[in-house]
Amino acid sequence: MLKNKLDYKWVVLLLVSIAYFLPEWMSEDREVMEKEFEAHIKEIGKRYKGRIHNWDVVNECLDQANRGIMPDDYTYKSYRWAMKYFPKNVTFNTNECNLRYDITKIRRYVEIVRDLTDRGAKVDYMGVQMHIFKPYATRDIAAGKFGIYSPTEFYDKLYVMSEAERPIFVSEVTISVPTDSDSDREIQMNVAKDYYRLWFSHPSVVGITWWNLADGGAVAGEPSYSGLFDADMNPKPSYYALEQLINHEWKTRFSVPAPADGLLKFRGFKGGYKVIYTDKKGRQVVLDYTL
């Protein structure tokens, strides 16, 4: 990954759940747990210093039902530890909620992020998930029966999230289908394409992460057919559709003669640009520009 200069992030420093992710040897004493959590974050920070620059700090802090006994205020403390043990130039994110949740939970999430930042926690991005774990729901969406996956409601919820004044990542996307048939592959592709267009169009959304890269690679209990690749790592139609959006439809490429006044105007997507021109002395100049 490092050789190929891929841009990637760590999910997640503290994935705290008694049922699934805490080791059996973990003490139930809050003070002992707090020391273990800090030691864990310190070790990860030391091991990957300078190698990974984008970090989800705490996963799903809104849902406390399956957390069991936890250190007091562990979400805030986790950010403070991360700020202490990681380089200053890395980004820290939240990874929480689901766009299909009701608006009350979305607003609660906004309150949590505001509380963290008001107390000095470094929260650079606000992550929100969108999992369709019920495969037949994707067929319904393709047929216009949206239910809790309403695009209009998703868009409205993103505006509520933007009240936290943080850029938004759609941090985990699952679009599953019941079978690996050609028709279900096409349904997955069309639903994925439409939701990606929706998220890309929102001014606060700065990134999207697909959750399960290949079929059959999900956490136990999650649907089998939810990847961009099949189980043999062959690209599926969804992969090609998203590649077309990201690398072609959503990139501004053009070449024009230099205007007489030397002032070039254009309308393009937000992001990084490489401007190449030839100066009066015939030299080629390359500039990096952010719109």
Where are these regions (language model features)?
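Active-site cleft segment of glycoside hydrolase catalytic domains centered on the general acid/base Glu
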Residues: 21-90, 94-111, 136-152, 182-187, ...
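Conserved, mostly hydrophobic/aromatic
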Residues: 44, 55, 82, 126, ...
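Structured interaction patches on ligand/partner-binding surfaces of diverse proteins
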Residues: 280-291
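Active-site beta-loop-alpha junctions enriched in small/polar residues
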Residues: 13-16, 57-60, 97-100, 128-133, ...
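Glycine-centered loop-to-beta-strand initiation motif
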Residues: 256-268, 273
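Substrate-binding cleft of secreted/luminal carbohydrate-active enzymes
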Residues: 171-172, 187-223
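Catalytic cores of secreted or luminal carbohydrate-active enzymes
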Residues: 230-249
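Short, well-ordered coil/turn segments that N-cap beta-strands
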Residues: 4-8, 49-54, 86-91, 121-124, ...
